[in-house]
Design a protein with these regions (language model features):
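Acidic, mature catalytic/reactive cores of soluble proteins
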Residues: 1-417, 422, 473-476
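Intrinsically disordered, polybasic Lys/Arg-rich low-complexity tracts
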Residues: 398-476
């Protein structure tokens, strides 16, 4: 009992500022169930548990507060229930093509806390099973094609996070190769290969090592548009050119298929069309389907606007990471501004938390669930990225300062030696100065004697010597 009490006290947060309020809110999403189950409630007051949102939320709502055990318990709950190499329920690729791939992204964040060895030991079998399931195909809806890309399609079931349905039909039909699904697929395969290579799983490496290059080549070929950004999906009718935020995921993962030039084009497009102070719009305002507000209207109209305009905070973490990866510390002021934009929200709508989504048009009114797990997790994740970059900037500045200080003593030493040399005689001890004066006087006397000797008349040679000299000159 004492241990439970101590653990409970340790988990308490003091709501004294913006971040501490969000940390307190984050604790409320993690639920302990009977039977050693740990789940993540997607949002309050009406959302339940979602596999996709669990994976996306976990790093921000657990790891950023130092509660890695909660993250591990939630993952273990889902892994224990896997069947035939796949998660069950709404975490299955059969109904959510991207959900199992977010599992790999979550593990990448967890690795920073526990190390790659522990990740591969605990979750390597599940990772390999999931990849094999995609290779075999899932539920007749998800398949890995020969070009290395994942195809997901279902007539009446939206297979991605844009899953609103009106009258039994998806609001945003995206059957085909979805941009974020395939970005996550590439990231998952590369991450599994990295861990397998480090921990001597030669069989897995041999079976999968040729796939990433094929996936990357196909992705760039199919998704890159002449306009510079990425298609939202590529279906039977070709690429869909709607400007949507899903392409930013391809720039915000650890393993990317895009070169720096294409990443910049994607970031520029997102910044120009989709970025708001509260999140990324789900559609460009230039699109005829765009809806800037959820105000009024029927539930169907609000569902339509939610995926055709409304701004979602959870996407911002991938935009911020993508910008940091390209601009590094130069992006810090903008990242701080993005974080500060949510400060006022904890005093309205969902007190002390971040809501599900916002209107895409000013004044960006709060909408949806008053407290959403992946919104809170994303903002806390952004805060963590800013903190890490700030610390790195401080270390670099400190290192540069030490280097500058190291140069100054060298310059001073050189100047000092020159000054010492110049004033050496003045600074000599008296005995040394006296010895120098005596030596100087002796040298002067020696020089005077030499000059005196040179002034004496030259001694005459004997006559025989003169004759010999003359004979030598004439040669006779």
């Amino acid at each position: 009992i004492e241990e439970v009490f101590a653990a409970s006290i340790a988990r308490r947060t003091h709501k004294i500022d913006f971040i501490s309020c969000l940390e307190h809110s984050a604790r409320q999403f993690v639920i302990r169930r009977p039977g050693d189950r740990t789940e993540v409630v997607s949002g309050y007051p009406w959302h339940g548990v979602s596999g996709r949102q669990t994976f996306v939320s976990l790093p921000g709502i657990t790891l950023e507060q130092g509660h890695k055990e909660d993250c591990i318990d939630a993952l273990d709950t889902l892994v224990r229930e896997m069947r035939d190499g796949m998660f069950t329920g709404n975490a299955s690729a059969a109904v959510a093509a991207d959900a199992p791939l977010w599992f790999f992204w979550t593990l990448q964040q967890l690795e920073r806390e526990v190390g790659g060895k522990q990740i591969w030991k605990a979750y390597g079998p599940a990772m390999k099973d999931i990849l094999e399931s995609y290779r075999r195909g899932v539920g007749g809806r998800v398949a890995l094609h020969d070009n290395g890309l994942v195809w997901a399609a279902a007539d009446d079931i939206p297979m991605t996070w844009m899953n609103a349905v009106i009258d039994g039909r998806p609001v945003t039909p995206r059957n085909g190769y979805q941009v974020e699904v395939n970005a996550l697929w590439y990231n998952a395969v590369c991450y599994a290969l990295e861990l397998a290579g480090k921990h001597a799983d030669k069989a897995f490496v041999k079976a999968w090592e040729s796939l990433p290059a094929r996936t990357q080549a196909s992705f760039v070929e199919l998704f890159r548009l002449p306009e510079g950004y990425l298609a939202d999906f590529v279906g039977t009718d070709g690429p869909d050119k709607s400007t949507r935020p899903n392409m930013i995921v391809a720039c915000g993962l650890d393993y990317k298929m895009l070169d720096e030039e294409l990443q910049l084009e994607v970031i520029r497009t997102v910044r120009q069309h989709l970025l708001t102070p509260k999140g990324l719009r789900t559609l460009s305002p230039r699109n005829l389907l765009y809806k800037g507000s959820l105000e009024g209207g029927s539930p169907a109209e609000r569902d339509f606007a939610g995926k055709n305009g409304s701004a979602w905070p959870w996407l911002l973490q991938f935009y911020v990471k993508a910008c940091f990866d390209i601009d590094r510390d130069v992006f810090l002021p903008q990242a701080r501004e993005i974080l500060a934009n949510f400060d006022e929200d904890i005093q309205s709508y969902g007190i002390g938390s971040i809501c599900e989504l916002y209107d895409a048009d000013p004044p960006y009114a709060s909408r949806g669930a008053i407290s959403q797990a992946w919104s809170v997790g994303a903002v806390l994740n952004i805060h963590s990225m800013i903190r890490e970059r700030t610390q790195e900037e401080a270390r670099e500045s400190k290192t540069a300062g030490k280097a500058a200080k190291a140069v100054k003593p060298v310059a001073k030493s050189i100047a000092k030696k020159a000054a010492v040399k110049k004033t050496a005689t003045d600074n000599m001890p008296k005995k040394t100065a006296a010895k120098t004066a005596i030596a100087k006087e002796a040298a002067e006397k020696k020089s005077a004697a030499k000059k005196s000797a040179e002034k004496k008349p030259t001694e005459k040679k004997p006559a025989a010597t003169k004759a010999a000299t003359k004979k030598t000159k004439t040669g006779k």
